[in-house]
């Protein structure tokens, strides 16, 4: 029961602190609006008259796409070919085992020869 009371007290304290912060922030924001004399109608008008520069946006997108194409050509990237190559890759495990055994034999001979 003690833990429940402590937890409840902490929860209430946390809510009170958060509410105080909200009130302080709201008061500070309203003070700023009063100081700068920002009118809601002015803000609406400014928002309505905002027009993004669509030509610049299109040109930037086209430039980025061209850069991507140049990188693909430069590094010879073809994702579909890479996927196919990865899916069809089948290592020759017999050759790998044979090479590993040869290397192990050579290593054993070197140990004997150099007394390692």
Curated annotation (Swiss-Prot):
Cite the post-translational modification comment: Cleavage of the propeptide depends on the processing quadruplet motif (XXXR, with at least one of X being E).
Keywords from UniProt, A to Z, are:
Pyrrolidone carboxylic acid, Secreted, Signal, Toxin
Report the locations given in the UniProt record: Secreted
Task: Extract the Pfam families matched here.
Answer: Latarcin
What InterPro entries would the database entry show? Answer: Latarcin_precursor
Q: Where is this motif: Processing quadruplet motif 1?
A: 41-44
Extent of the signal sequence: 1-22
Motif Processing quadruplet motif 2 per UniProt: ranges: 80-83
Q: Which residue ranges traverse the bilayer? A: none
Q: Main subcellular localization, coarse class?
A: secreted
Q: Which residues form the propeptide?
A: 23-44, 80-83
Q: Give a brief account of the tissues where this protein occurs.
A: Expressed by the venom gland.
Q: Which GO terms describe its molecular function?
A: toxin activity
Which GO cellular component term is one of those annotated? extracellular region
Q: So what family is this one in?
A: Belongs to the cationic peptide 03 (latarcin) family. 06 subfamily.
Q: What is this protein called?
A: M-zodatoxin-Lt6a/c
List the source organism: Lachesana tarabaevi
Upper lineage is:
Eukaryota, Metazoa, Ecdysozoa, Arthropoda, Chelicerata
């Amino acid at each position: 029961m003690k833990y429940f009371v402590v937890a409840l007290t902490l929860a209430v304290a946390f809510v009170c602190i958060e509410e105080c912060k909200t009130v302080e922030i709201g008061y500070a924001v309203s003070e700023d609006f009063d100081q700068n004399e920002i009118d809601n109608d002015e803000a609406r008008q400014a928002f309505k008259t905002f027009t993004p520069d669509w030509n610049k946006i299109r040109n930037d997108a086209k430039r980025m796409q061209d850069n991507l194409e140049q990188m693909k050509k430069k590094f010879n990237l073809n994702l579909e070919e890479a996927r196919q190559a990865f899916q069809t890759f089948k290592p020759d495990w017999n050759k790998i085992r044979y090479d590993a055994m040869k290397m192990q034999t050579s290593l054993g001979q070197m140990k004997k020869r150099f007394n390692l």
